[in-house]
């Protein structure tokens, strides 16, 4: 079997409806849009959130909060994610990024104490929780703050 031999399962694909193709098609003339009105026109229709002139929900509800432009984006991961590495590995934020454990470093990486660590690793990160430090040292490794 080759790629050009592949065919869809019979009945799995329908032909697209061709609207406005004559009265006999059942979708001629107005093409399923009804008679006149805003929704019958090209480009017609109301924007998302429009409620027919009634005060829309997004304006009835109060504003809340603000965006803190000084907020630090700390990427947190649990110690059990570090079991992926071999014994004796020096785990850095760059290595975590390369292996796909984190998507970006942001303003720092913090190691949290979720799960169990079974490998003796030297972990270098910007911050550690107390339980994470204990688990890393208990497994025979070191926790170094960058």
UniProtKB/Swiss-Prot annotation:
InterPro entries: Ribosomal_uL15, Ribosomal_uL15/eL18, Ribosomal_uL15/eL18_sf, Ribosomal_uL15_bac-type, Ribosomal_uL15_CS. Residues 21-35, 42-52 have a biased composition (Gly residues). Gene3D superfamilies: 3.100.10.10. Signal peptide: none annotated. It holds the Pfam family Ribosomal_L27A. GO terms for molecular function: rRNA binding; structural constituent of ribosome. Keywords: Ribonucleoprotein, Ribosomal protein, RNA-binding, rRNA-binding. GO terms for cellular component: cytosolic large ribosomal subunit. One of its GO terms (biological process) is translation. Residues 1-56 are annotated as: Disordered. Part of the 50S ribosomal subunit. HAMAP family: Ribosomal_uL15 (MF_01341). Binds to the 23S rRNA. Belongs to the universal ribosomal protein uL15 family. PANTHER family: 50S RIBOSOMAL PROTEIN L15, LARGE RIBOSOMAL SUBUNIT PROTEIN UL15M. This is Large ribosomal subunit protein uL15. The lineage of its organism: Bacteria, Bacillati, Bacillota, Clostridia, Thermoanaerobacterales.
């Amino acid at each position: 079997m080759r790629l050009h031999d592949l065919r869809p399962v019979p009945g799995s694909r329908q032909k697209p409806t061709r609207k406005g193709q004559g009265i006999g098609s059942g979708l001629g003339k107005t093409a399923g849009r009804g008679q006149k009105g805003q929704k019958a026109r090209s480009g017609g229709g109301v924007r998302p959130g429009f409620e027919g002139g009634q005060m829309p929900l997004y304006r009835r509800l109060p504003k809340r909060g603000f965006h803190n432009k000084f907020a630090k984006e700390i990427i947190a991961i649990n110690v059990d994610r570090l079991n992926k590495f071999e014994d004796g590995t020096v785990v850095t934020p760059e290595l975590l990024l390369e292996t796909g454990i984190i998507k970006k470093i942001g303003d720092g990486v913090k190691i949290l104490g979720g799960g169990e660590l079974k490998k003796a690793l030297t972990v270098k990160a910007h911050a550690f929780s107390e339980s994470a430090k204990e688990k890393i040292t208990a497994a025979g490794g070191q926790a170094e703050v960058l």
